[in-house]
Regions:
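Active-site segments that bind and position negatively charged phosphate/pyrophosphate groups
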Residues: 1-120
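C-terminal charged capping/lid subdomain of soluble metabolic enzymes
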Residues: 101, 105-178
Length: 178
């Protein structure tokens, strides 16, 4: 639908602009496109007519509360383990993400393979531009996990309402990420 196409276009724009900004930090156009993309992504237009999933933000906020890291850094640290956990519950959307954002050829792949390839492409891009991929990089360790899980507000209405055990699983996978 239109909301999905808009979101996918914004993500493609972010990928292009972030690569350009990392290659040349003084590239005003690239940086302005990152900000413009972020503005559109967060102005609620993308969620019109959709069930929204904000759980990754809730986990990120809890990580920030314990580590004092910025929200963007906490999101990048927990996004991949979270998306891999919920992928089976939004398989069609993750498969679309792979083809429409990353250009992955769907030939010979089922939705699960396609979705996993899309998340692998996202991980490669995040590494390429220098995103934080582990909460350890933010100052968390095994002793922080219970406090972060306790501070995570779980929300209904997304792909899945996470249990505390699942939140801890996301955190442990992020902690172990290299």
């Amino acid at each position: 639908n239109t909301s999905d196409y808009l979101a996918e276009s914004l993500m493609r724009s972010l990928v292009t602009a972030s690569r350009a900004a990392v290659a040349n930090p003084t590239n005003y156009e690239a940086r302005s496109n990152i900000m413009w993309t972020a503005t559109w992504a967060l102005n609620t237009l993308m969620g019109c007519g959709k069930t929204q999933d904000w759980e990754v933000h809730m986990i990120g906020q809890a990580v920030g509360a314990v580590t004092d890291a910025t929200h963007g850094m906490t999101l990048s640290a927990v996004a991949l383990p979270y998306y891999r956990l919920i992928m089976p519950y939004g398989l069609e959307k993750f498969a679309r993400f792979a083809t429409n954002v990353w250009g992955i050829n769907a030939a010979g792949k089922d939705d699960e393979e396609l979705a996993a390839a899309g998340l692998d492409a996202m991980e490669n891009w995040m590494r390429e531009i220098g995103c934080v991929l582990s909460i350890r990089e933010l100052g968390a360790d095994e002793s922080s996990l219970d406090a972060i899980a306790d501070a995570t507000l779980t929300m209904t209405g997304g792909y899945r309402t996470l249990t505390r055990v699942e939140v801890l699983d996301v955190l442990r996978k992020s902690l172990a990420a290299k």
